[in-house]
């Protein structure tokens, strides 16, 4: 269960039912076939190519939604200059995901979407080994958090600076308290990309109810109920990191007192409950 936060003025996706749904991911410029046969065998770290999969029906609505999510991530600005990162979405009613398998979230297309089971099995599309290596941290978040509907990973510059310094982001920006990160953003210890050690470190660092974690020497991972909330939290984390670094030149950032973080969150909920005011 995540801390609730003020709603966003975007269309919410279908709520993921039980059992945990499938994931969607955009794959940069790689092909995603709508039919055909895939042969068995090992594919990459944590990913196994399904044997004999024919004519898999791909959910076009979810693929289009995932492409839009990737576009929104890029538009948010909370991303590195080269656009490196990946996004995934649960697929309602299936223990699977669609995943962005390309090297960049920029200039992607529906044909770049791949489909995987939450056990890491590749069901549809082409998944390069370097992207396949990060699948495990996406599936881990879905397995550990049944209410998560979207996982977002980027190398946004300021948040990554904290990750490289192995320093958590403190709750010195009010928006962190308002959107479910009153503890700030923790740091997961480094582990080689896609390894069991890396995934284990992420799980160990995750704070219950807090939908983000920094990945030491790597980047940032955000996981939330909806894509809209994941994008919003990703942007807030990057803004807080930038503010912290800028404040370092004038004495350093000052965290909000713990009791006032709770008050800031509760106040946000009061205004949320009132809805939009009209003159």
Residue ranges and their predicted role:
Residues 10, 23-24, 38, 49:
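Leucine-biased recognition of intrinsically disordered, low-complexity hydrophobic segments
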Residues 17-21:
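Compositionally biased, intrinsically disordered low-complexity segments enriched in Pro/Arg/Gln/His
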Residues 2-3, 43:
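Aromatic (phenylalanine/tyrosine) cluster motif
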Residues 15-16, 40:
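Positively charged N-terminal leader segments that act as targeting/secretion signals
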Residues 35, 39-41:
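N-terminal amphipathic/hydrophobic targeting modules at extreme N-termini
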Residues 50-279:
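Glycine-rich flexible loops
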